[in-house]
């Protein structure tokens, strides 16, 4: 098959629905790890910074390279869209092939249990309808990823459409809600842990030609973004609503990627998201650490509403009644978030922000948790280990400036 990985084509992804994606913006300072459930326990971190942990280079391809820092994979890609995709594919080929096989196998098994469900067909339909709105750059990067990984282009396209089925929640705190005024933007990604995505976690540092450099907390074989920040200190998060099937627009993960690559300010981010045709129903949190400030967005293909801090929305729970807060969540998790915000209002720092994201705000299926402090040039990432939620695992601290300025070891 022209050297491409042969994977059984079958119904899949019926369980590939994101349970909850929690995006957090907190203005304050430092760190993280979790042990037992609950916000009152101390937090821990380990360093992934070059001054204390020497990165181990695992491979070099063109302008890109793969390294391991504090036990975690960090992929650097640079250049044209095709070059970045090809570097990604070559350097992570075994992992990409393994993940695609795993996803298709899981889908096949689920299809046998529920013959009426055809998630593969739905995802392929989504791609076809989104295709007119997917940039040539993204299409070229997907082609490079396919060539580099030896996975068929159709399979690469299909797996990259998975975020269109995601569902999420989020919030932002800043100004009077925090201590010191430093912007922290965090994310909790709750997902079907049994699919093993957390075993393929990869921090991606991208330097696309003529665009912003950005950091993407992602997974092998994916070029879109659900959690990320750029070198202009603009950070993006999202939560999903309804509207599944409204796919005549740019896929959410590619829109997030567009924001990372192009936005130099909060205003830029709002303009990009407002001007770009969108899919389904999504709520976004965009923050700019330079100001600092944040906005919530309530969007559908035919709607674009900008929510200022503290503003309510009919499809979201009532605000907590505090200033400088954008809360986007639901059900009991929202009530717990609100209680934790009120408890530490005006005192939020890094540890408090990380405690805010602990179980049961994070679900048992939490596969990654992240906290960004762009103005400080630091961020912290935790990935699930086995069946232990990421929110209860050790965080790794990274130096964003060091990563953005890193030079190829070649």
Predicted feature locations:
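C-terminal, well-structured catalytic/ligand-binding subdomain of enzymes
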Residues: 36-146, 177-184, 188-410
């Amino acid at each position: 098959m022209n050297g491409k990985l042969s994977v059984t084509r079958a119904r899949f992804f019926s369980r590939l629905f994101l349970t909850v994606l929690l995006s957090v913006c907190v203005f304050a300072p430092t760190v993280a790890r979790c042990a037992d459930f609950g916000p009152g326990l101390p937090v821990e971190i380990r360093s992934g910074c070059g001054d204390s942990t020497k990165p181990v280079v695992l491979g070099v391809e063109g302008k890109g390279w793969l390294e391991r820092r504090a036990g975690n994979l960090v992929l650097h890609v640079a250049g044209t869209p095709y070059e970045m995709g090809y570097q990604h594919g070559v350097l992570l080929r075994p992992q990409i092939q393994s993940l695609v096989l795993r996803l298709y196998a899981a889908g096949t098994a689920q299809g046998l249990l529920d013959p009426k469900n055809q998630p593969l067909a739905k995802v392929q339909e989504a791609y076809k309808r989104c295709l007119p709105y997917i940039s040539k750059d993204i299409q070229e990067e997907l082609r490079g990823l396919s060539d580099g990984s030896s996975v068929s282009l159709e399979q690469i396209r299909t797996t990259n459409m998975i975020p269109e089925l995601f569902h999420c929640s989020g919030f932002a705190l800043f100004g009077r809600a925090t201590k010191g005024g430093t912007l922290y933007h965090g994310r909790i990604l709750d997902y079907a842990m049994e699919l093993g995505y957390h075993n393929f976690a990869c921090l991606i540092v991208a330097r696309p030609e003529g665009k912003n450099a950005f950091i993407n907390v992602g997974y092998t074989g994916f070029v879109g973004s659900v959690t990320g920040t750029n070198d202009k200190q603009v950070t993006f998060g999202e939560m999903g609503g309804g509207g599944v099937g409204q796919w005549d627009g740019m896929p959410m993960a590619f829109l997030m990627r567009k924001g990372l690559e192009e936005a130099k300010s909060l205003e830029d981010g709002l303009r990009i998201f407002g001007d770009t045709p969108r899919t389904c129903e999504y709520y976004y949190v965009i923050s700019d650490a330079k100001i600092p400030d944040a906005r919530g967005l309530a969007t559908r293909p035919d709607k674009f509403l900008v929510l200022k801090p503290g503003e309510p929305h009919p499809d979201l729970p009532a605000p907590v009644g505090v200033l400088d807060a954008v809360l986007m969540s639901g059900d009991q998790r929202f009530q717990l978030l609100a209680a934790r915000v009120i408890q530490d209002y005006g005192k939020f720092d890094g540890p408090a922000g990380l405690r805010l994201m602990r179980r049961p705000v994070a679900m048992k299926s939490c596969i990654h948790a992240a906290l960004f402090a762009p103005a400080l040039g630091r961020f912290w990432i935790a990935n699930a280990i086995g069946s232990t939620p990421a929110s209860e695992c050790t965080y790794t601290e990274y130096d964003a400036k060091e990563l953005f300025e890193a030079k190829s070891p070649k």
